[in-house]
Amino acid sequence: MMEDPLIPWLTEHGLVCHPHTLSGTPISLGSAFQLAGLKLAWRVEIEQRRVWIVLIQRVEQRRGLKNPFAALYMLANAARAVLGPDYYLYGNVDVLAGSSLSTQRLAHFYRRWTGAKELSTGWFSLKVSQVITLSNMKKRQNNGFA
């Protein structure tokens, strides 16, 4: 697997990145970092112009998340800065273990509030140039723009 082009940018912004493998085997699935109570693993696919989100997982048991979108926002910023605005975040929507939120409700959120496109059941794509902060998302919601 090629060197991940996002790692230098993420490292410059204070994150520690490491390889992410399949269940502890030597099979590489991409790279990962931890931020705001979550572990996020991804793989850049240059040919498809996408950043495939391989895993989002709580690193602490049900203590609440500071901002559940902070890791995704950081990844989108890295992709936009390094790869350009025409890349996409891509991944399968599933709720975090132990969450009371349903997969359907989370999928609705991604479609309605983020503008993500559901390419096939549960698989979403969102242009990195469209990713906004949670604060801005709430402002849009409160002003009726979502």
Swiss-Prot record:
Pfam annotation, one family: LcrR
Alphabetical list of InterPro entries matching this protein: LcrR/CesD2, T3SS_LcrR
Transmembrane feature ranges: none
Key words of the record: Calcium, Plasmid
Domain of life: Bacteria
Role noted for this protein: Involved in the down-regulation of lcrGVH transcription in the presence or absence of calcium and is necessary for lcrG protein expression in the absence of calcium. Plays an important role in the regulation of the low-calcium response.
UniProt-recorded name of the protein: Low calcium response locus protein R
Higher taxonomy: Bacteria, Pseudomonadati, Pseudomonadota, Gammaproteobacteria, Enterobacterales
Gene: lcrR
